């Protein structure tokens, strides 16, 4: 599973990359990720680079994570999006962009890993179907 992680805070990115590395070491060695410090760079990369999951901070300068999700949904209605934020204020709005989950910071393994486990299981169960479409 390939993840795009987008957060403007270097501190949060350090914490999240530590958690993703821990997840890779303890649960799924095939997990990979790319890091983005703003939504503009993420939006420019998505059309040319495949991601299986997006982890988006909501409150970022410029294009917010919610704005990025709206733009992504115009061309990709299926990619799972998990919002990571320190505010519960946008939880209801996250349903409008079909978010897979909404996690409040600070994150730890107890919050993040069960969500990743579920999405990874969904991803793996859909993989044979996706591969069959590629070979058609």
What residues fall within each predicted segment?
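Residue-level detector of beta-strand face positions
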Residues: 129-131
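Conserved small/polar residues in nucleotide/adenosyl-binding loops
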Residues: 134-136
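CheY-like receiver
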Residues: 41-127
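Conserved acidic carboxylate
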Residues: 7
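Non-catalytic signal-transmission and effector/linker regions of two-component phosphorelay proteins
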Residues: 1-4
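Two-component/phosphorelay signaling modules centered on CheY-like receiver
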Residues: 10-34, 74
